[in-house]
UniProtKB/Swiss-Prot annotation:
[4Fe-4S] cluster 2 binds at residues 109, 138, 141, 144. The gene is nuoI. It comes from the Bacteria. This is NADH-quinone oxidoreductase subunit I. GO terms for molecular function: 4 iron, 4 sulfur cluster binding; iron ion binding; NADH:ubiquinone reductase (non-electrogenic) activity; quinone binding.
Amino acid sequence: MHNEHIEEHFNNRNVTELSSEYYMVDIAPYPTDGWGKFTRTLRRAIRGELFVGLWVVLREMIRFDIHTIQYPLEKMPIGPRYRAVHEMKRLWESDTERCIGCGLCEKICISNCIRIDTKLDENSRKEVTEYSINLGRCIFCGYCAEVCPELAITHGGEYENASDQREHFIMYQDMLTPLDKMKAGTQKEFEGFGAITPHEDERVKKTPLAY
């Protein structure tokens, strides 16, 4: 009974009368032969859109106002909190690896690209024997740096890591701070995602509710 009601309503629908809000569009037939396609292209060319695009190109050539940079000879500056290839920090006191092998970064990684192997040393303290990050799977979300209790893993500014070999994307020693950089005192600490960039007070307008 229900199906018969639906069929009756479908057959009695009004599809002939058009509302005043609608109007018929005169669609030109699609050309099927070569001459028809040629005439259609000619009509589109002399309509004006082609000359508008050519005028824009000619105008920018005369102005010599270049809006691009010559990469890789020129590079755009990167913010201090840009999330690029990871950096593994060392301790300032002993120059040893700061990672304690807690495994929080491995647990929170949503792309499952961090692997940590640990063991107990002669003093029954946990020691990291293997730490690897598969950059081919990493989405650079920053959760590993945010959850690290020792600020051992951070994001750096190195983004040129293209390669045609997958094994090149699994690295650790390349991310560890070099000893000469530690001795020079140039290792940058992680300011945190909630911290503002340096000299930001000069550019940010303070409000009464600023904290």
